[in-house]
Curated annotation (Swiss-Prot):
Disulfide topology: none
Natural source organism: Leptothrix cholodnii (strain ATCC 51168 / LMG 8142 / SP-6) (Leptothrix discophora (strain SP-6))
Similarity-based family: Belongs to the universal ribosomal protein uL15 family.
Protein's name in the database: Large ribosomal subunit protein uL15
Pfam hit, one: Ribosomal_L27A
Length: 144
């Protein structure tokens, strides 16, 4: 066997369907589109969501709520993530450098999820009531 004699396995490749190339091909004349009607014409079909003139679903349903753009400035970390960190004093700048919070984050809060067994001092970082109790129980504190 030579490299120039390698061919795909039989049946693994299919020829591209060429429509409108004579009646002998089986896909000539109307090219598989049937006779007349909107879908047989050039220029495509109706828009996505169009319901034939009936009021479309996305306009029948009321608007509801919104997505706050302030969310990108808030971040949260867990007690489990604090446990993994190899530092004793944690502040916002450190969390950004490590990549635990995004660059846009301005407010960070610790939530009670996971275990914390070592003392950690948080500077300028908030905590939920449960997380605060767990941090203080481990010998840590929250500094303003």
């Amino acid at each position: 066997m030579e490299l120039n004699s390698i061919k795909p396995g039989s049946g693994s490749k299919h020829a591209k369907r060429r429509v409108g190339r004579g009646i002998g091909s089986g896909l000539g004349k109307t090219a598989g589109r049937g006779h007349k009607g909107q879908k047989s014409r050039a220029g495509g079909y109706h828009k996505v969501g169009f319901e034939g003139g009936q009021m479309p679903l996305q306009r029948r349903l009321p608007k509801r709520g919104f997505k706050s753009h302030l969310l990108k400035f808030n971040a949260e970390i867990t007690l489990g993530q604090l446990q993994v960190l190899a530092v004793d004093e944690v502040d916002l700048l450190l969390l950004k450098q490590i990549g635990l919070v995004g660059e846009l984050a301005k407010v960070v809060k610790v939530v009670k999820s996971g275990e914390l067994t070592r003392a950690v001092v948080l500077k300028g970082i908030g905590a939920t009531a449960g997380a605060k109790a767990a941090i203080e129980a481990a010998g840590g504190s929250l500094a303003a």
